[in-house]
Amino acid sequence: NAGEVASGIAVKTVMSLVKEAVEHQDMNTVDAETGMSRHSIVLRDAIARANKIIYQTAKTQPQCEGMGTTIVACLFFDNRVAIAHVGDSRMYRLRANRFEQMTMDHSLLQELVDRGFYSQAEAQRATNKNYVTRALGVEPTVDVEVHEQPAQKGDYYALCSDGLSDMVEDEDIHLTISTFGANLETVAKQLIQLSNDNGGRDNVSIILAQVVDSFAAKKGVVDKILGWFG
């Protein structure tokens, strides 16, 4: 269907552009105006490009009219992670038994939570979860939300579609990662099974990652010399 076409374009475009940038650009720079790392900028721009391609495809191919998709993506670098998303696909982090949602949904429901009409607990049980306020391919341009967080050894990260987050409580996602974290493939299978057991109204997409060691960027000669002087 058209949604699968849109998500396929998004995955292919973002992966290709990020891979090309990492291999051929100087990634050790920071934008002087925004303070954004090159990694965040590359991720943002790749998603913006995917949006444009999806939008143009929908306009030129009648069978794809009105198609769109949500996205969440991340890029690990220098003991940090750049996180970008559009829509209600989410990223979670488990750190030292503290489980947190690292993205805020671009949805009508989240706006109602922000304005105090719903608590987070009430929002989890709400029926109007799927009205997104941002998506790829709907407009010629899109506002990609990007931020960075420190990444630590032992962290677990879960990126997922609403097919998981709508059907499985955050507490159960937390418990599943904590219980089966030694084998991420098992975690993924358990979470998909939980979603299906709870009604499985939508396809489930999930990516899991664990930080197994420090991945600080290698310093150049000048950086090392400056480091000697504190």
Over which residues does each language-model region extend?
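PP2C/PPM-type serine/threonine phosphatase catalytic domain
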Residues: N1-G230
